[in-house]
From Swiss-Prot:
Keywords: Cell membrane, Disulfide bond, Endosome, G-protein coupled receptor, Glycoprotein, Golgi apparatus, Hydroxylation, Lipoprotein, Membrane, Palmitate, Phosphoprotein, Receptor, Transducer, Transmembrane, Transmembrane helix, Ubl conjugation
Modified residues (Phosphoserine): S246, S261, S262, S345, S346, S355, S356
Organism: Rattus norvegicus
Gene: Adrb2
Name this polypeptide is given: Beta-2 adrenergic receptor
Annotated glycosylation sites: N6, N15
Length: 418
């Protein structure tokens, strides 16, 4: 999304006149172009490389193929499209001082830009709802949101995003009627996004503000529930140690079950924090732009063009942040290391008790590797020996149903590898 009213001059250009034939100014301009080209190339490479890594990791390792990570894949796809089809052309528009790709691609490129932002925030909104269901209804979660249902939800997100982005632009509902805008629409070398006031406000509300409000509200509820659950765990542990101290001394299995449940809940809450960071980063990167986007159509000369384009690029840079945030997850870190050949590609035991073999599939192994022992505090087991029912509580402070695998181990199904 390029700034409204841009007259195809150097955006983000250094201060000072650009008088023709002035050697000093010309050298400054050339240095600025080279510097910006390098910076923008780094941004594009970071976006593409990071999100390809995320998509490949989830596709290759079955351990990462959870419902939540299906949504993470959708988010990574939106960021990848941004890095491949939006940011490079935006960089060219800035550096070349004109649009070199024709009117059709100008509108198509702008539509893709709006599509990626809309799909991203709607996916984040869905992730917030997913985590809310998972933490408030852990026993119903697997039936309420299966992987097939997740695929349908993702498809609906992209269909809705496509309609709200492509339809108004391709139908020219966005177009302004003043002379400068009409002249730009007619020129093959002008791709400035002149919009009417109604479109700017309506598109910002539908594509950003409404999903943002829903996301913030739902996630605030998630953290409230999570806080209450941690308090229940603390109380359950207190009652357990007070009433069953002698039994624990004789048989440590009950204590192990309670500790394992607490570990699982702490892992879930760490996953919530990671997702919260992702949502918070997205909001911080895009909210300033959408505020300016509305202000600009109300008071055209209030916001300098340089500020507008800087905030637009701050939103673009967000697409490179998410892969870095995913590194908070031990599962993602291990997957990234193996994909980058920083770990052996032979069978690897994950901290959750699963191993990755040479063909990329994951199998369960009961053995603990050296890595697993060293990371026990950080990467808690999700598949453990079945504890005694009398001492095993779930994240809500109640006794959960147990799923026993072929080796007699308890596999909690509500996992979140993030």
């Amino acid at each position: 999304m390029e700034p409204h009213g841009n007259d195809s001059d150097f955006l983000l250009a250094p201060n000072g006149s650009r008088a023709p034939g002035h050697d000093i100014t010309q050298e400054r301009d050339e240095a600025w172009v080279v510097g910006m080209a390098i910076l923008m190339s780094v941004i594009v490479l970071a976006i593409v490389f990071g999100n390809v890594l995320v998509i490949t990791a989830i596709a290759k390792f079955e351990r990462l193929q959870t419902v939540t990570n299906y949504f993470i894949t959708s988010l990574a796809c939106a960021d990848l499209v941004m890095g491949l089809a939006v940011v490079p052309f935006g960089a060219s528009h800035i550096l070349m001082k004109m649009w070199n790709f024709g009117n059709f691609w100008c509108e198509f490129w702008t539509s893709i830009d709006v599509l990626c932002v809309t799909a991203s925030i709607e996916t984040l909104c869905v992730i917030a709802v997913d985590r809310y269901v998972a933490i408030t209804s852990p026993f119903k979660y697997q039936s309420l949101l299966t992987k097939n249902k997740a695929r349908v939800v993702i498809l609906m997100v992209w269909i809705v995003s496509g309609l709200t982005s492509f339809l108004p632009i391709q139908m020219h509902w966005y177009r302004a009627t003043h002379k400068q805008a009409i002249d730009c629409y007619a020129k093959e070398t002008c791709c400035d996004f002149f919009t009417n006031q109604a479109y700017a406000i309506a598109s910002s509300i539908v594509s950003f503000y409404v999903p943002l409000v829903v996301m913030v509200f739902v996630y605030s509820r998630v953290f409230q529930v999570a806080k209450r659950q941690l308090q229940k765990i603390d109380k359950s542990e207190g009652r357990f140690h007070a009433q069953n101290l002698s039994q624990v001394e004789q048989d440590g299995r009950s204590g192990h079950g309670l500790r394992s449940s607490s570990k699982f809940c702490l892992k879930e809450h760490k996953a919530l924090k990671t997702l919260g960071i992702i949502m918070g980063t997205f909001t911080l990167c895009w909210l300033p732009f959408f505020i300016v986007n509305i202000v600009h159509v109300i008071r055209a000369n209030l916001i300098p063009k340089e500020v507008y384009i800087l905030l637009n690029w701050l939103g673009y840079v967000n697409s490179a942040f998410n892969p870095l945030i995913y590194c908070r997850s031990p599962d993602f870190r291990i997957a990234f290391q193996e994909l980058l050949c920083l770990r052996r590609s032979s069978s690897k035991t994950y901290g959750n008790g699963y191993s990755s073999n040479s063909n990329g599939r994951t199998d369960y192994t009961g053995e603990q590797s050296a890595y697993q022992l060293g990371q026990e505090k950080e990467n808690e087991l999700l598949c453990e020996e079945a504890p005694g029912m009398e001492g095993f509580v779930n994240c809500q402070g109640t006794v959960p149903s147990l799923s026993i695998d072929s080796q007699g181990r308890n596999c909690n199904t509500n996992d979140s590898p993030l």
